[in-house]
Amino acid sequence: GRILSAGQKHARVAALGITAYMEPPFESFRSLSPEDFVHKILVECFAAKAVFCGDNFTFGAYAAGNVDRLKELCAPLGIAVTIVDMAQYGGQTVSSTRIRAALEEGRIEDANAMLEAPYCIDWPVRHGKGIGTSKLGKPTINQNYPADALQPCTGVYLTRIWLDGRWWPSATGIGRRPTVDAANAPVTCETYVPGYHGDTYGQTPVLEFHHYLCAVRKFGTLQELADLIETAAQQSIAYFAAKEEA
């Protein structure tokens, strides 16, 4: 699944000062030979004068072209090729595979370090079952994951959410709710924001994940579940207060 939504990806590219950004479907050029890729895409489509890529870049059908072949093909066309050093983390090259693994294993700090920004979602707020409000006294914001998005490790996270022009410390649970749901219930993403009482339905607030707190488990009573939610929320408040002081 995708790590960033299309909107998040475009915003990050725009923040770098890039004024035009294209993301053509891979199927539209996957069968081109390296030679055709250079002539049809770089020359005919873009009239490219310079190309930048990582040292592990491959192109053309079956990844037949590498950076050396790219230089060979571009040189007689007057296209400059610049090879950019790959980002490193923990002594290894950063890749989407490593980031996905970190998210799926609950290593949110590692994922954030490789992303160079907090992992976040901006899905629309949906109506839930109202259990947080009616039975727990802890109203939650529900932002369920689309089918094509990567779902992080299930569990409870210390998060913060952008609402009404400011960041709010929050606690987020991802997974099935064994205390109140059947075993085959869909996975949910619910966020409790202590002190917030606004209406978020239909909005797309940004929710940042900062720390994995604990696994989801079944409680004997609803009060025990409510206590965990409150404890997690207070830990989130303390966590972000400490970050501001640092």
Residue ranges and their predicted role:
Residues 74-175:
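Glycine-rich, Lys/Arg-enriched anion-binding loops that position phosphate/diphosphate groups
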